[in-house]
Amino acid sequence: MENTTRRLPAPNARRCAFTGYRPCKMPFGYDEDSPLGRDFRKRLRETIEVLILQGYRHMISGGAQGMDIIAAETVMDLQKRYPDVTLEVAIPFEDQAKKWPEEYRARWQRCIDAADMLTVISHEYTKNCLYARNRYLV
């Protein structure tokens, strides 16, 4: 898996990066269809839309389970309304999703496939690749 650019963000585009809790630490766990999960997605969408309206045009997801993937999916949906918004997925290593539950692997792959840019920090897992990805995000 190589770094891929399908579409570059506009020059000097304001950027916002997303990373956060994994499902096991989310108040709704893996049940995103629960009332808490639906409320979280609604509030996240509203927040990202406010950022877009404030001029943020390049969104970066860390690609992890939980917040990262939910944010990427939200951006993908908002791109229908705001086609000038770009999505970058920055993953710490190529096989990041290899040991994940099948549903999350499929969601991860959809995010990778839809991303305007894919940034691969390391070809294989290293003890520092997650820190390097986080540094890249900020």
Residue ranges and their predicted role:
Residues 2-138:
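Acidic/glycine-enriched connector segments
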